[in-house]
Regions:
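Conserved acyl-donor/pantetheine-binding loop and adjacent beta-alpha core of acyl/acetyltransferases
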Residues: 61-96, 157-166
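Conserved beta-strand-loop-alpha-helix junction that forms the acyl-donor binding cleft
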Residues: 101-104, 129-141, 157-168
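Glycine-rich phosphate/pyrophosphate-binding loop shared by adenosine-nucleotide-utilizing enzymes
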Residues: 2, 53-59, 92
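Conserved GNAT acetyl-CoA-binding A-motif
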Residues: 92, 113, 120-133
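Active-site rim helix/loop that mediates acceptor-substrate recognition in acyltransferases
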Residues: 25-51, 57-67, 79-83
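A short beta-loop-alpha structural element at the N-terminal edge
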Residues: 2-15
Length: 182
C-alpha cells in the first residue's frame, strides 16, 4: 500500500536517489532542475511513499501547459519549467515518473501511475495529458497504453539507445480526458 503526498524541497535527496536508480546518467535530471520544479509547481510533484515503513518508493513530476509544443527542446532533460508552465494550462505534461528498482515488477508502477493520473485529472481539470517515453522502454509504454495514452508524435534520436550504441526515438504519448476522447 502506498500514500501519495506532495513532494517538498526536503525530499530532494531521495528524489535524486530514485532518479539515479531509474535512469542512465545521460538522461538523469540535475538536482537544480528538480529544485526549480518543486519551487515553480509543487502541487504537480508527488512522492509515492510505502505506507508500511514510510519509505519513498518513487515520484511523478508534472507541469501544466497551454498547448502541446512541436519542438523537441521543450521535452528535453533539463528543460526550464518556466518556459511553458501555466497554472491554468489545459495540458498536463508528465515530465518524469520513476520507481526504485525494488518496487518494480509487482504491478506497483501501473497502480501508482494510475492513482497519480486520477489525482492530477481531478485536481487540475485538464483536457489532456502527455508524456515522452523512449521507444525501447516497452514496460513503461504498456503502462501508459493501459491508461489510454496513444502515440501522438515521434522525435528522432531523443534518447541514448538501451544498447549503449546510438540513439532511439522519443515517443510523445497523449491521452484525452474529454468525454469524446480520441
Amino acid at each position: 500500500m502506498f500514500i501519495l503526498r506532495q513532494a517538498e524541497i526536503s525530499d530532494i535527496d531521495v528524489i535524486m536517489q530514485i532518479e539515479k536508480d531509474s535512469f542512465v546518467p545521460a538522461i538523469m535530471e540535475r538536482r537544480e532542475v528538480f529544485e526549480q520544479r518543486l519551487n515553480v509547481f509543487p502541487e504537480g510533484f508527488i512522492i509515492f511513499e510505502d505506507s508500511k515503513n514510510h519509505r519513498s518508493a518513487g515520484y511523478i513530476c508534472t507541469e501544466l501547459w497551454d498547448c502541446i509544443p512541436s519542438d523537441k527542446d521543450f521535452f528535453a532533460v533539463g528543460h526550464d519549467i518556466k518556459k511553458l508552465h501555466n497554472a491554468n494550462g489545459s495540458a498536463l505534461y508528465i515530465s518524469s515518473f520513476a520507481l526504485l528498482k525494488e518496487f518494480r515488477g509487482a504491478g506497483n508502477g501501473k497502480m501508482l501511475f494510475g492513482s497519480a493520473l486520477n489525482f492530477f485529472k481531478e485536481k487540475f481539470n485538464t483536457e489532456n495529458a502527455l508524456l515522452m517515453v523512449n521507444e525501447e522502454w516497452n514496460a513503461a509504454r504498456r503502462i501508459y497504453e493501459s491508461y489510454g495514452f496513444r502515440k501522438y508524435m515521434v522525435f528522432e534520436s531523443a534518447f541514448p539507445a538501451v544498447s549503449g550504441s546510438g540513439f532511439s526515438c522519443g515517443i510523445i504519448m497523449k491521452k484525452s480526458f474529454s468525454a469524446n476522447a480520441e
